[in-house]
Amino acid sequence: MSAALRPVPRPGVLEIEAYVPGKSAAPAGVKLHKLSSNETPLGPSLAAIAAMRETGAHLELYPDGSATDLRRAIAGKYGLDPERIVCGAGSDELLSLLTYAYLGPGDEGVYSQYGFLVYRIAILAAGGTPVVAPERDHTADVDAILKAVTPRTRIVYLANPNNPTGTYLPFDEVRRLHAGLPGNVLLVLDAAYAEYVRRNDYAAGLELVAESENVVMTRTFSKVYGLAALRIGWMVAPAAVVDAVNRIRGPFNLSTAAIAAGTAAIADDAHIAAAVAHNDAWLPKVTRALTDLGLQVTPSVGNFVLIHFPDAPGRSAADADAFLTARGLILRRVGAYGLPNALRMTIGSAEANEAVIAALGDFMREQDDA
């Protein structure tokens, strides 16, 4: 067959840079502390593990394609109508489905400068054009986002809190953003880290979804619930948006194990409280300790911190990453986000956090002595 006749992806597909997950390997013989993917150090709820195991005797059966039990559990937790909830294989799938449903060739999707990489991937996969709004102090800027909106804009994506910076917008600013958008533009509030936020002026956005026809909120079970391996996400949206997404959603996009584990996890309030309390204790400790070493740390409300390094030989983020990796401490390079001189560190176990602080202290001292 002639090479000229081989199948060719449609325009734009090969412009997509595939998402690269955080590293998960250390050198042989070195204890691994994986702090690259914002996973909870407490692991999943024991109730979730038990519920998942109970599904193992009936693997020949298809799962409930509507994830009814999980939607009802989520609705009960947050006081929502289960008919306004869609579950997906992680919030990533839901972000993609929303994009495919509402954005196509010639359309634009707007997101902030250091927003989640999946937005760009989804927009390009749908044949649309990504539009990036500049941030201010590593924080989304409502005025810049509104300025980026054009008649071709179909979706505005806002990660709140944002990954990888850990910054957030107060709810008044989110409302101002929504008020400035045309009614035909969908505002997608990506609240993957909402459970960790301890700020009185923050809200994930449920109120705005309830009172609007063009607002969606997505959430995940991959972070505070510790179920990243099972890929469980959910969104709450206006009925018309739910209908559109369900028309293109795969009929069995969540496994029976995922549905069972998620249903049990969301009911385990004690486990969630313990995970949040661990973060409450360690986030300020890690931030203060790294700052005391002379490193700049972006103030974070999530379960991670963004650490900035000098753009200098021997002191760069790449140098620090190599130094840490050799000691089994795996952080996240964020050059793909336009932050080549930074590393993102998950708030891990006490042992892992202390190991990173000690290792970065050694790294900084070695450079001072060089």
From Swiss-Prot:
InterPro entries: Aminotransferase_I/II_large (IPR004839), HisP_aminotrans (IPR005861), HistidinolP_aminotransfase (IPR050106), PyrdxlP-dep_Trfase (IPR015424), PyrdxlP-dep_Trfase_major (IPR015421), PyrdxlP-dep_Trfase_small (IPR015422). It catalyses: L-histidinol phosphate + 2-oxoglutarate = 3-(imidazol-4-yl)-2-oxopropyl phosphate + L-glutamate. Pfam families: Aminotran_1_2 (PF00155). Its EC number is 2.6.1.9. GO terms for molecular function: histidinol-phosphate transaminase activity; pyridoxal phosphate binding. It is an enzyme of class 2 (transferase). Keywords: Amino-acid biosynthesis, Aminotransferase, Histidine biosynthesis, Pyridoxal phosphate, Transferase. The modification N6-(pyridoxal phosphate)lysine is found at residue 223. It comes from the Bacteria. One of its GO terms (biological process) is L-histidine biosynthetic process. Its cofactor is pyridoxal 5'-phosphate. Pathway: Amino-acid biosynthesis; L-histidine biosynthesis; L-histidine from 5-phospho-alpha-D-ribose 1-diphosphate: step 7/9. NCBIfam families: hisC. HAMAP family: HisC_aminotrans_2 (MF_01023). Homodimer. Belongs to the class-II pyridoxal-phosphate-dependent aminotransferase family. Histidinol-phosphate aminotransferase subfamily. This is Histidinol-phosphate aminotransferase. It comes from Methylobacterium nodulans (strain LMG 21967 / CNCM I-2342 / ORS 2060).
